[in-house]
Structures are given as structure tokens and as C-alpha cells.
Amino acid sequence: MATSSSAWLMFSDHYPEILIAIACFLIFSLLLSARSSSKDSLPYNWPIFGMLPAIISNNQFNDFTTARLRKMGWTFIFKGPWLLDMDYIFTCDPSNINHMFNDNFENYPKGELGKVFDIFGNNIFNADGDLWHDHRKMAQTILWDGNYRTMQATFIRNKMDNALIPILDSAACKRKPVDLQDVLLRFTFDTSCFSVLAADPESLTMEFPPVPFSKAADQALDAALTRHITPRLIWKLKRFFNVGSERTLAVAWKVIDSYIYDKIAELKAKRKLVGKINSYDAVSFYMDNFNIHDDKFLRDNAFTYLLAQRNTQSLTMTWLFYALFENPKVELKILSELKSIVDESSERKFNDGFALFDSNMIQSAIYLHATLCEALRIYPPVPFEIKDAHKADVLPSGHKVRAGEKILFSPYAMARMKGIWGDDCLEFKPERWITGNGTLKHEPAYKFFAFSAGPRICLGKELSFTQMKMVVATIIYNFHLQMVKGHVVEQSNSILMDMKHGLMVQVRKRSVM
């Protein structure tokens, strides 16, 4: 026995690379086994590793989760590695979502998950209890203010006139493909900066300049996703030693803070120089209406508003156009509706032969609104969310929840369940949102979760619809877009459902006036 032990030690001393190769082979075999298992079966629960190898080996998390939820009746238990507190309940059951966001709302606060998104600071996104109520009341006052909405609508129209249309027109004239996702991200970044900070960064220009803030924000969200799938102790150690994704987050955080604090300082300096100005941006609103001048408070809320507007709107519109490429009959119906609106409108606005749709003109665009709803259903900009249980609970599905246990729910998967949306759930079908009387059909928020549900439902829902309809209508009426042949559309593995390779399109001017 001693001889064989000595031989093993000698072997390991002289041939460490062979041991490394053996270890790599075993790990590779584990991942291969996880990857080759039936796509509809529950992930194999390995000793020590749990079900994590199945996640690591899969590059399409949303589709992976959807297949398992479909097989397991909309809810299953995900077992993480031993001793690392990474067990989850995965669900797309509307009754469970209604329970967490409505019936037992107080038991599912932001809690510990707020620490994962600490870059947002102490604001409406991370707050709980009375502090959250206070933030929400202030946000409601801002977002529902008539002057704020008018200012935004005017700026969006001007941005379409002076930036969006010229760029698409140039692409059409030069027959040069453009990345529509990038165009829309820049557009919504400019509009959100103006509505929040009274500043136009002019990121959407012919030169397509670098946008350090946007890059940093994307890196910060990626780091947050890494925290979600990493044991808490590990990512906190990485943060302490400033390595890996935590180092990337720290650098991105500085870029974000520098940009927002600079804009707040500029706005305050302008106000000090000329006195109170009639500006209805969010930061000015906090200072004028609530007498809040603390830079940290303003920074935290500004960052939340910026990301909420920039990311969700741009990604929704990007996926909508992709859906139109796959369903050209839907685009023709939208175009027909827009022609009728333009013909009947007394507020027809043209510039250099291009039609501009304002907030009043698109109110009657029922089919366009339904198409946006369908895009949000099938391609939710936030494909999954995570909740922590404050106390032990039992979900309507019958699954027991331990205090502190995490629940991942998937609006993306919900949209793909026949038992929830019908046998045609995989079809892009705006008609499902229109009643027999031609009005918009309402679906409960816990089923159509694009704007959250319950007390935390998005306050800017209708404002967001109005703004997106203005942009989409203006693009569709004036231009015909086609996806570049051979372009691959693939979801990123991210907290947000952006396109990994963008959306490359060819642009052609329409002749519809």
C-alpha cells in the first residue's frame, strides 16, 4: 500500500500536467453530460455541483429555462452547489407571480437582492417599506406631470427630425447598412438624458461617437448578472480584492458617477447663474417641487430613470422590428393604419418630405399599440427577475418557500406556455390584443408582466407606450427596413434581452404620401 502511495506521489510530482489533463477531462465530461441531456428534462443534480453545470454549459439561458418550465408544469426547484445557498425556485406560473406581487407583496421585498444592484443606490428600484412609498409618490408626481410629458414629447419629435430621420435617410441614400439596435439605444439615451438631466449628449449623430456612459452601464448590468449566478461570499471576496467582474464594475461605476454628477453640477450652476428656470426634467423637479438638492439622492434617482428609459424602450423597439421582418403582413397593417391617421389628421407635420408623428396623432393607432404589446409579450426587455422571500411561504403552485429562498420567475417563459397564452402562443399575433369591438384588450399584469405588477407596477407605462409609438410610427411610415441577409440574431445572456450581434438593416425610403 505504501509503495503504491509513494508511486502516486512521485507520479504527481513529475507529471502534474497529466493530473491537470485528467481533471480537465472530468470537468469537460461533466459539462458535456449536462449539455447532452434532454432539453426538456430537469437538469441533473450532481453531487457537490448541483444543477449548475447545466446552466454553465448552456449559452441560451432563457430558452433553457423555458423548456424545463414547460416540462415541469411551470415551476421547478433548481439545486445549486452544496453549501453555497444557491438553490432557486424557477417559475412562470401566473398564480405564483400574482401571489408574490399582489396577494403577499410584503413578504417579497427587494431585501438582500438590493445589495446585488447596489450601483443603483438608495432609490425607488432598491427601496422597501416607507422609503419606497416616498420614492414612488415623488416619481408619480414627476412622470404624470403634464409639463414633463409635453417637454419629453417635444424633444423626442425634435430628435427624430434632427437626428433619427437624417441618419436613416443617409443610410438609404448610401445603401449602407446600419445597426438598428445601436441607433435606437443612442436615440433613447439622448432622450432619457434630456428628460432626466436637461442635457442632450448628442450620441445619435452621423459620426456615431463612443458613449462611455452607455458602455459602463452595460458593464454594470453584466456584473450584476454575474453576482446572481455567483455565491454571495465569492463575489464579495472578488469585490474586496478588486478582481474580475467586480473590478470591471468598480471602473464602470466611476464612469457612471462622473457623468451623472457632472451633469447635476452643470444644471445647478446654470440655475445659480440665471435663477430658477422653467425646466421640467426629473432632477429639476426634485429640486423645485420637493426641495431635494442632495447630490447623492439626485444621482441615484437619475441613474434609475436613465436606465429605465434607455434600455427598455430601445430593446422593445428593436425586437419589434425584428418581429416585423419575420411577419411582413403585420407591417403592412401598421402602415395602412398610419396612412389613415395621416390622411385624417389636421396636424400633419412634414419636414423635407418626411412625416413626423406626435403624441396626439398616434393615440388612435390601435393596431400599432397592439403590436408593441405583442413585442413586449414575446420579447420582454427584462426576461427574468428574482425575488427573496422574507418569511417562509407556500406558493399557489404548492411549492414551499423557505425564508430567504430565492425565486426566479420568467416572463419570457410565460409567453411561450400554451396553457397561459393559448395554442398560438409562439405566433407573433397583435390581433390577440384587440377585442371584437376594435378596442385594446386588457390582460392582468401578472400575466403580461412587461411593466411589472402589483404595487410596484411601472408608473411610466402609458408614457412609454406613447413615446415608442411616436418613434416606430415615424420609422415605418417613412422607411422600409430589411434585415441584412445572413445576419444572425441571437439573444445575449444578460439581465436585459439585447441582441448579441445587434440588428443590421438595410434602409429604403418609402413613397406613401
UniProtKB/Swiss-Prot annotation:
Q: What is this protein called?
A: Noroxomaritidine synthase 2
* Record keyword Iron present: yes
Q: Which organism is it from?
A: Narcissus pseudonarcissus
- A single GO molecular function term of this UniProt record: monooxygenase activity
Catalysed transformations (reactions): 4'-O-methylnorbelladine + reduced [NADPH--hemoprotein reductase] + O2 = (10bR,4aS)-noroxomaritidine + oxidized [NADPH--hemoprotein reductase] + 2 H2O + H(+); 4'-O-methylnorbelladine + reduced [NADPH--hemoprotein reductase] + O2 = (10bS,4aR)-noroxomaritidine + oxidized [NADPH--hemoprotein reductase] + 2 H2O + H(+)
| Top-level taxon of the source organism | Eukaryota
Biological-process GO terms, alphabetical: alkaloid metabolic process; lipid metabolic process
Q: Does the keyword Iron apply?
A: yes
